Amino acid sequence: MSKKDYYEILGIAKNANEQDIKDAYKRLAKKYHPDRNKDKDAETKFKEMKEAYEVLSDQQKRAAYDQHGHTAFEQSGMGGGFHNSSNFSNVFNDVFSDFFGGHQQRTQRGRDLRYTLNLTLEEAVRGASKEIHITTLVHCEHCKGSGAKQGTRPVTCTTCRGVGEVHMQQGFFTIQQTCPRCHGQGQMIKDPCRQCRGQGKVEEPKTFSVKVPAGIDSNDCLRLNGKGEVGEMGAPSGDLYVQIHVDRHHIFERSKNNLYCKVPINFTTAALGGEIEVPTLDGAIKLKIPPETQTGQCFRIPNKGIKPEKKTPGDLFCTVFIETPVHLNEKQKKLLRDLDQSFCETSSKKNTPETKKFLESMKKFFDNLTH
């Protein structure tokens, strides 16, 4: 199948100058780039005009094409290996500058850092100011971050000529890759700084003050902008992310903005009712226990939970459990026996309805087994 004429593909005359070729390529690249044109033929046309530009923008390849046509490249495959196609790289970046608002950056933003900050429940509830200590990478003071020995400076990479990228040409297609020699920096250091060993960065301990807002919870994250590692070649520093972990409390458990606690009561208070003291974040308060309270009964105390900034406060939920008395003396034991006897003399079913239900269920269970 015969290939299209490269001049025809770009829509230019055979005597077109270098600027005409570049302008034609930019115009067609914007029109047929797959990211902008979803037509099924756009990708094919984009590859064709890219191939045409690679040949016509290179004086030697253009001369060979003008003399021999497409056969000039059938044997050599247009060469191979890494090379710095500066014309193609520049115009390609120009096109993407129009697409995305700027040239691609070779500089690399600093790495983000993470730190786990442990808080007590009281600190998380009320808010706190905490200091954290980390070790991070900062610019080397001896070389001012250049990585080069004092009195010297980095030199332009001879492989990519400072572009930071090379192009592997396979037939009519060009693969863009990071320069293997300078690793995308576009510069090389001949005499590295002894302090940072050419890295331009050194480790240094840092102390930061962190304002913890009231009501924060475990797994919440605070971001300190620009407090991460320094960037490459003047790029911005990364951020420091402070992950919050709230320690377990010896009284309260937390769920969002609500607090939960278990409170023991004696069986007399459970049976007859009364008042007990329960803890809150603001101090102890009185809680009224109604008569005939059972273990597991939960009492809600409004607005005594977590009080986050500018949000509705949570509630406190107190679950009571009846504590069985221990280490009884003989008098106490006799009183309990007398009480138990009084239950027998009256209707125990009336005093202990749950026991009655259980015994009836157990009898029914065994009856079913024997039938």
UniProtKB/Swiss-Prot annotation:
Positions that bind Zn(2+) 1: C140, C143, C193, C196
Entry annotated with the keyword Zinc-finger: yes
GO CC field: cytoplasm
Binding-site residues, Zn(2+) 2: C157, C160, C179, C182
Family annotation (InterPro entries): DnaJ (IPR012724), DnaJ_C (IPR002939), DnaJ_domain (IPR001623), DnaJ_domain_CS (IPR018253), HSP40/DnaJ_pept-bd (IPR008971), HSP_DnaJ_Cys-rich_dom (IPR001305), HSP_DnaJ_Cys-rich_dom_sf (IPR036410), J_dom_sf (IPR036869)
Annotated CXXCXGXG motif repeat ranges: 140-147, 157-164, 179-186, 193-200
Gene3D superfamilies per record: DnaJ domain (1.10.287.110), Heat shock protein DnaJ, cysteine-rich domain (2.10.230.10), Urease metallochaperone UreE, N-terminal domain (2.60.260.20)
GO molecular function term, any single one: unfolded protein binding
Sequence ranges assigned to domain J in this UniProt record: 5-69
SMART domains xref list: DnaJ
Cofactor remark: Binds 2 Zn(2+) ions per monomer.
Span of zinc fingers (CR-type): 127-205
Assigned keywords, A-Z: Chaperone, Cytoplasm, DNA replication, Metal-binding, Repeat, Stress response, Zinc, Zinc-finger
Cofactor: Zn(2+)
Record GO biological process: chaperone cofactor-dependent protein refolding; DNA replication; protein refolding; response to heat
SUPFAM superfamilies: Chaperone J-domain, DnaJ/Hsp40 cysteine-rich domain, HSP40/DnaJ peptide-binding domain
Subcellular location: Cytoplasm
CDD domains tied to this protein: DnaJ, DnaJ_C, DnaJ_zf
Function: Participates actively in the response to hyperosmotic and heat shock by preventing the aggregation of stress-denatured proteins and by disaggregating proteins, also in an autonomous, DnaK-independent fashion. Unfolded proteins bind initially to DnaJ; upon interaction with the DnaJ-bound protein, DnaK hydrolyzes its bound ATP, resulting in the formation of a stable complex. GrpE releases ADP from DnaK; ATP binding to DnaK triggers the release of the substrate protein, thus completing the reaction cycle.
Subunit field text: Homodimer.
Domain writeup: The J domain is necessary and sufficient to stimulate DnaK ATPase activity. Zinc center 1 plays an important role in the autonomous, DnaK-independent chaperone activity of DnaJ. Zinc center 2 is essential for interaction with DnaK and for DnaJ activity.
Family membership noted in the UniProt record: Belongs to the DnaJ family.
Designated name of the protein: Chaperone protein DnaJ
Originating organism: Hamiltonella defensa subsp. Acyrthosiphon pisum (strain 5AT)
Lineage: Bacteria, Pseudomonadati, Pseudomonadota, Gammaproteobacteria, Enterobacterales
Gene symbol of the encoding locus: dnaJ
